[in-house]
């Protein structure tokens, strides 16, 4: 009995120690160091920062398409999962930044138009992946959850982005938006 308890304690200790390690491995930063630097450099420029998040999310989907079309790709299912996860993390960060700028009452109408266009593009690419007929079921099961989650998030967000743009247009008519976000880009072409 005592040996069994001792054994159980050791197993539990090992599981608890391994848990944070495996969790850290799953939640890596989807941004490269140069991308992090670019984001940091635009921290007070909503228009530029939001454009960067769209650009980075788009790059993950482009990389996904390239990887999936390459016949030499090894471990396609895992790479698909990881790129979709990176896309989801970047897209969530985009939405978090939108929320921040809305809370500050910044005028983000121009980047919202870009984001709405990107939403349509992202929806099409994610649906094409979901509807791909030539993918074995075993492969699909590896990334099906993250794909469904990403598609649901983009669908919901696209609707919210359109509503937010309408709200921003209305607020601009009543001059309720801060134009301070425009001062950094004043005189610069967009």
Question: Which role does the model predict for each range below?
Answer:
Residues 8-19:
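Bacterial N-terminal signal peptides
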């Amino acid at each position: 009995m005592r040996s069994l308890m001792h054994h159980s304690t050791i197993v539990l200790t090992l599981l608890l120690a391994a848990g944070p390690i495996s969790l850290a491995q799953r939640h890596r930063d989807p941004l490269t160091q140069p991308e992090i630097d670019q984001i940091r450099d635009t921290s007070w420029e909503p228009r530029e920062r939001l454009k960067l998040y769209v650009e980075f999310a788009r790059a993950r989907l482009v990389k996904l398409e390239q990887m999936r079309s390459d016949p030499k790709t090894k471990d396609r299912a895992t790479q698909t999962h990881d790129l979709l996860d990176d896309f989801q993390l970047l897209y969530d960060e985009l939405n978090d930044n939108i929320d921040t700028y809305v809370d500050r009452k910044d005028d983000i109408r121009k980047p919202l138009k870009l984001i709405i266009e990107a939403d349509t593009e992202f929806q099409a690419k994610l649906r094409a992946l979901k509807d791909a007929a030539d993918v074995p079921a075993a492969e699909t099961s590896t990334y099906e959850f993250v794909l469904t989650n990403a598609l649901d998030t983009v669908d919901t967000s696209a609707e919210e982005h359109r509503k937010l743009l309408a709200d921003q247009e209305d607020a601009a008519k009543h001059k309720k938006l801060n134009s301070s976000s425009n001062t950094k880009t004043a005189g610069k072409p967009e």
